[in-house]
Amino acid sequence: MVVVGAPSEATPSTSKNTDAYFKTLKNYNAFAKANSSRKKVLYVGANNGILHAFDANTGQELWGFVPPLLAGNLPTMINTALNTDKEGGSNAIYGVDGSPVVSNLFIQSPLSVGGAKEWRTILMAPYGRGGAGFSVLDVTVPDRPIHYYSIYNDKLNKKVHVITHRAEISSYDYDSIPSEYDYTKLGQTWSSPRIARIPNSGA
């Protein structure tokens, strides 16, 4: 569970190799000011397979997100053998069972004009007991979330499944998987994700 509101402005810094210096360099404060009136939202995963977004002030649900690679589990939530007097009950399918993490990142997003990098608020939702995978969403505008991609490691069939923001699904066999999608060692994602800036070919 995580509560996200307006981004805080960064403290100016001239000390290199710090987050504060990077934010100063990339004009983070302009992004913070542009989103200063953003509503406060509570994001929480549930064992019904859905990531829920609630208005933190009113408690009203804004939307729910079902990871596309886990949607096939939804029918198993109904169990007619339970609570037979009331025509059945429900099983926990977990789904988005991990703790979501949110961070403001300077990235080249699918929404970027001309491929330029920009500041976006990114939510990463691990599946926890729901499976060996995670989903990444853009929640810069809380009422209009954007699914960037989801990854799921299917250990039973020895495949890694990837779905993009264009709803394009790719499945890679363990023995022929591209290095950028080599999540063959990924297990159930119980730990909170760590989002960090690292060197990448000078980018």
Q: How should these model regions be labeled?
A:
Residues V2-A203:
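A fold-level detector for beta-propeller and closely related beta-sheet-rich head/sensor domains
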